[in-house]
Amino acid sequence: MSQSEKNFSQEHERLSQRRGGESESRNAGTPVQVARAQRQGNGAMLGQLSINPTVMMIIQVLLGAAVVGLLAQVSVPLWPVPVTGQTLGVLLVGAALGPRRGAAAMVAYMLLGIVGVPWFADFTGGIAAVLKPSFGFIIGFIPSAYVSGKALEGKGPHSLLKLFGWFTLATVLPFVFGLPYMWAVLYSLGKTLSFGGIMSAGLVPFIPGGIIKAALATIILRVFIIARRG
């Protein structure tokens, strides 16, 4: 091979290598394109790691039950009986989670308490709670939370009066279930009370506290609505 042929061969090889490098550079993309592709890949990975909606619902329900269990241990001295935060927790959890999830949270609160989680009032729990005259009120928490969840439904203005009306109704519902249950348990124990006696024992002393808790829930929710708009 002559010297000129060797020079031509070497020049051709250099041109081929240069073209190959340019092709690889185009395939790899610019640094900006590479960074964008990496971000898209990371976003797709985060999307795959997002929490399943069913799992999220279960977490919300259990957290709602835990909030009520925690507030059930809070007691404020008030005449004629102390006021606990239990019903207030029911109202707020129902409003926060909505009708169905709020009611589901109260079902979880009741069932887990029955199987032994000590989050009923005074850190009590267990199957024996079913035999207590006050257990009917816990049953009533289920429809109470459902009604509370209705407070924020609809597109109309959520005025203080409207919210207070919903929460007052939700406060009444535990008594609708609790008073007959109380009468039935006491009757099974041989302690028969008249209608007036049941009202005096299970309703009248709790009216002031019920009004206060409905008002507190109304104020808290109204502040939340205003803050969310702002």
Where do the protein language model's features map onto the residues?
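Membrane-interface elements of multi-pass transporters and channels
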Residues: 74-81, 100, 115-119, 123, ...
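Membrane-embedded alpha-helical hairpins and interfacial helices in multi-pass inner-membrane proteins
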Residues: 155-230
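Generic alpha-helical transmembrane segments of integral inner-membrane proteins
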Residues: 62, 66, 70, 92, ...
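Residue-level signature of transmembrane alpha-helical entry/exit and packing/kink sites
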Residues: 53-61, 86-90, 102, 133, ...
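Hydrophobic transmembrane alpha-helices
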Residues: 2-11, 29-105
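Alpha-helical membrane segments and adjacent membrane-interface helices in multi-pass membrane proteins
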Residues: 72-147
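Compositionally biased, intrinsically disordered low-complexity segments enriched in Pro/Arg/Gln/His
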Residues: 24-28
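Short helix-perturbing small/polar motifs within transmembrane alpha-helices
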Residues: 30-49, 56, 70, 127-176
